[in-house]
Amino acid sequence: MKIRVGMGYDVHRLVPNRHLFLGGIKINHTLGLLGHSDADVLIHAICDAMLGAANMRDIGYHFPDTSAQFEGIDSKILLKRTTDLLAEKGWNVGNVDATICAEHPKLNPHIPAMKACLAPLMNVTQEDVSIKATTTEKLGFTGREEGISAYAVVLIEKMNK
C-alpha cells in the first residue's frame, strides 16, 4: 500500500462582528475570524495537508480567495470537495492529527463536536481524527489574542483498484 503524509497550516485575524467557526462548528466568542470564507483555520489547515500529501498544490489554488464563488463559503464544503479531489486521484484519508493555537476561547470542550463534524466529510471515523488545543502562553499574535492558528498532519493512502 502506498502512503503519503502532508502538513498544513493556516492563520486568521480575530475581529469583532464575525462568527467564530473552528472544526466546522460555531463557537460562542466575542470575536470571529476574518477571511474570504468562514475562515475556519482548522479546516483550512487540514485541506492544505491533504492537498500537500497528494501533491495537488494548496487550498488557495483550488479555492482562491479572489473568486466570488468562495466568498463566505462554509469551509465544510471545501473539506468535502478536497476529499473528493483526492478520491479522483485514487487517495483516501488515513488519519488526521491537528492542533489549534488560541488563548481564548477554551476549545477542549468543543473537540468532540469538531471530530464528529469533520470525520464524515473525510470518510473516516472519529478515531482517525485527532484534534488538540493549546495556547502560546501569551506570546506572539495568538498570545495577544489577535488571531488563531492551526496546524495539521494528514496521512493518505492509495486506494486499491
Give short role names for the model-derived ranges:
Residues 2-112, 122:
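RNase III-family endoribonuclease catalytic core
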Residues 111-115, 145:
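Short, low-complexity, polybasic intrinsically disordered segments
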Residues 118:
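Glycine-rich, mobile lid/loop segments that gate access to catalytic sites or pores
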Residues 125-128:
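Short acidic capping loops at alpha-helix termini that bridge into adjacent secondary structure
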Residues 131-135:
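Pyridoxal 5′-phosphate
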Residues 138-140:
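Short acidic, Gly/Pro-enriched loop/turn segments at secondary-structure junctions
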Residues 142-161:
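C-terminal edge-of-domain segments
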